[in-house]
Amino acid sequence: MRNKLRRLLAIMMAVLLITSLFAPMVSAEEGDNGDDDDLVTPIEIEERPHESNYEKYPALLDGGLDERRPSEAGALQLVEVDGQVTLADQDGVPIQLRGMSTHGLQWFGEIVNENAFAALANDWGSNVIRLALYIGENAYRYNPDLIEKVYAGIELAKENDMYVIIDWHVHAPGDPNADIYQGGVNEDGEEYLGAKDFFLHIAEKYPNDPHLIYELANEPSSNSSGGPGITNDEDGWEAVREYAQPIVDALRDSGNAEDNIIIVGSPNWSQRMDLAAADNPIDDHHTMYTLHFYTGTHEGTNESYPEGISSEDRSNVMANAKYALDKGKAIFATEWGVSEADGNNGPYLNEADVWLNFLNENNISWTNWSLTNKNETSGAFTPFILNESDATDLDPGEDQVWSMEELSVSGEYVRSRILGEEYQPIDRTPREEFSEVIWDFNDGTTQGFVQNSDSPLDVTIENVNDALQITGLDESNAIAGEEEDYWSNVRISADEWEETFDILGAEELSMDVVVDDPTTVAIAAIPQSSAHEWANASNSVLITEDDFEEQEDGTYKALLTITGEDAPNLTNIAEDPEGSELNNIILFVGTENADVISLDNITVTGDRESVPEPVEHDTKGDSALPSDFEDGTRQGWEWDSESAVRTALTIEEANGSNALSWEYAYPEVKPSDDWATAPRLTLYKDDLVRGDYEFVAFDFYIDPIEDRATEGAIDINLIFQPPAAGYWAQASETFEIDLEELDSATVTDDGLYHYEVEINIEDIENDIELRNLMLIFADDESDFAGRVFLDNVRMDMSLETKVEVLERNINELQEQLVEVEALMR
């Protein structure tokens, strides 16, 4: 029996060892963002059309903030009003600040320009702007010159009479005490300031400037990308406090920021003001606490927490804000969006109304995230999407106004809420101009045109030289153009036309008029449909001798155009989706001295909804990693919601193997963020963790259009989105395809340029659920256009590591075997 057991264990050990080399994955729990509990009743989040309810949410309409600016309000302070601490002006009168936050200045720094700040102050009615200075994520630590953007933003805010929040954008990692926030010298030998020195430096440069508000820690959180995170509890708040209190004290003691407002974040992405408001707040007279929320993730509530509720049971963000207010703490919503917490989906505008009504009612100041043309719901401007839209320029131009079409739905909505006016969205239906000939007479017939039965004069109608010739117009001479004038003219109509034509969106009706000698011709029109049979023409439209041009055959031709004002029934039909099928038209035709004229190419032109051809992807299939695509499916790969490219994902052959393929091109006009125009592919995979893997590898092939891969580079970035790390964990390495060195690439038998890509992932935590893997093909000043192929995507490790893993697992299994044998004795 014992020998059989040994053999069984040996077999199991062998199987486990083999498995360990190829799939060292473990299950991990998803992080809890903490926004649901049963202690308060949440207001349900629903993705549905927006309906403003100003009777229910009257605080949305307050007429704006025109007089509540630094030039009038002066230095800010905190006062107590009816038991609630709130922001006030220099005279102690409560003041609310409303405006926008920039996105990361390292990515979208071009928003810092005179025209943009003027637009925000004047056209948007903002009295505050927030400057988001990231530290990691290729920002201030790696490019200390970004501080110049902060200086420029401060100056522009002052010039445009706005308060300005200097945001030390703690994000990745989530512990503000992490080494990256301590300052030092970067890899290029450049010195960058730590948090305390940074704020002291700004205060010294702008001593006691009433415009300035200092935000010390954007979002403390459990995010462990690039360093440690903090816990969502009292210990997490204590970590924030231990970071913030010395900076607050240093600013006050410096004499350069004696009374400036300071804002401090809280654990769980600044959703735990309740922790900050408890037993150990910041010791300061002018400190506020940060509130962050996204209306597609964080539910509102009409309730507050009952007394005695423990901190671990407080998870509704709005209730946390109410808790802080009840405890006498002032809060400032320095970041919020109409999307879900990751910046996508929605927009959730009904929920935004709930939140903004709460903020406005309680005089809580706010800045919206964010001033970017990035392809995410929370961005304020129209993004670049290949074949769909061009990115809005972050400099609005000398008129200092962005048109509504240049704003995203979020931007349009937030602008109205800053202004305190009704939100009236524009029609964003994609439209296209069109021009279509209805009657061309090229078939040798009159195409249904006959003398109308009510015509006061008789004429002959026939097809001559593929045009509709009308003979007998000698006495049809009413050419004054007024409505009462055309009734005496000849009437023709398409009574025998047996077709219909959809003219939805038509704005004009035009036709060629051909005569033997130039003259004046007058035509009035009454288009007809089954739903709109009659509406008198307002007038005839005239063309005169000067409008005609001689043709090669000696005749003369002019174009006569009838608008909806001339023919109201044209508009009636063209604007009725249920009655837009044209089935007849009556024309009243008069001439000054011509007996015969010909009509040709009767055409409608206008503007109608554009219905793009649907993108046909190959079958998605089940998520698989490794991904070899040999089953003919995409094995779960899809476009990320922020991808600027959404062309067809198909399975094609590359180098003798199935591969995932798509076509795309980078635009000639480049945004400052090279990710803004990038294809973004993502794969969601259950229980995806790094484990012992060291890199992600895949085969990448490119097949460029001729002369469209000659300059710049394609930079391949690798991202995971673990919930427990703030949905963002980026591999520090990238893989560059230098298009100027394309000739040195391996070329396959089928003529493709082949790259064996490896991206190191050892800086990604190895024991948390990663949720999804994303590949971003960024545009580094590239002219690339063509087709690309992706194959054999896998997580892998070096041979040395495989040996180490094998040895470790052998040891573990041997220990287990000893334990089993001991039990058998």
From Swiss-Prot:
Provide ranges: composition bias, Basic and acidic residues: 607-621
Q: Which domain of life is it from?
A: Bacteria
* Active-site residue numbers: E219, E335
Q: Which family does it belong to?
A: Belongs to the glycosyl hydrolase 5 (cellulase A) family.
Q: What reaction does this enzyme carry out catalytically?
A: Endohydrolysis of (1->4)-beta-D-glucosidic linkages in cellulose, lichenin and cereal beta-D-glucans
Entry protein name: Endoglucanase C
| One matching Pfam family | Cellulase
Q: Which gene encodes it?
A: celC
